[in-house]
Design a protein with these regions (language model features):
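Conserved small/polar residues in nucleotide/adenosyl-binding loops
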Residues: 2-7, 162-167
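Solvent-exposed alpha-helices and their adjacent loops that cap or buttress functional pockets
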Residues: 6, 10, 61, 74, ...
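Glycine-rich phosphate-binding loop plus the immediately following alpha-helix
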Residues: 11-49, 150-154
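Adenine-nucleotide phosphate-binding core of ATP-dependent small-molecule kinases
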Residues: 66-95
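Internal, active-site/partner-interface "lid" segment
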Residues: 39-67
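Glycine-rich phosphate-binding/hydrolytic loop that grips phosphoryl groups
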Residues: 26-31, 138-164
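Active-site nucleophile and cofactor-binding loops and adjacent substrate-binding regions
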Residues: 1, 16-24, 84-87, 111-116, ...
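Glycine-rich phosphate-binding loops at beta-strand->alpha-helix junctions
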Residues: 88, 101-129, 140-144
Length: 169
């Protein structure tokens, strides 16, 4: 699942959790790259030099395979398909999953997270669509788990405090 947290003046302005799946995007790109005998890194690099990124729509990656096969039949280059996949993953996440109307609504200060953002083509596609430079932390792929661990620790500590207070009574 995906979550979008909007910050305004150092406070959370809104939180949106998707109602649809957006998982498996990175896995799909990696599997497709391997099917063409590319590493995911080389596949992403190819996308960065695409002349005509293939329009693969904004469908879930589960249903995108047929669009990719059609693009291959029509003679699209590996670079154009790779770029098209990166754009499609971002468009799906922003417009179908998070359901924003305009990418500029994201603002100019964006931090991305998730393992799929380790893919430079996906990151660059996001930046082009959003019209801003995004910050990709070194721990982008584990930020969700890290955040969950922090929440769990806070909950655990509050339970210990509550238990300690109850024992003192």
């Amino acid at each position: 699942s995906e979550m979008c947290i909007r910050d305004r003046n150092h406070t959370v302005d809104s939180v949106q959790l998707n109602e649809a799946c957006s998982s498996g995007c990175g896995s799909f790109i990696e599997t497709f790259a391997k099917s063409l005998n590319y590493t995911v890194v080389d596949f992403a690099k190819a996308a960065l030099f695409a002349k005509n990124p293939t329009d693969l729509g904004t469908r879930c990656t589960v249903f995108m395979n047929s669009n990719v096969k059609q693009a291959q039949k029509e003679g699209a280059t590996v670079a154009d398909i790779s770029a098209g996949l990166a754009y499609s993953v971002i468009k799906n996440a922003l417009f179908k999953v998070i359901k924003i109307n305009d990418a500029s609504d994201l603002g100019k200060h964006v931090v991305v997270q998730g393992g799929t953002f380790y893919n430079d083509a996906v990151l660059r596609s996001f930046e082009k669509i959003a019209g801003c430079e995004a910050v990709r932390p070194d721990i982008a792929g584990i930020m969700g788990a890290f955040g969950a661990a922090l929440v769990a620790r806070e909950y655990y500590q509050s339970c210990l405090l509550y238990t300690s207070d109850a024992a003192d009574d």
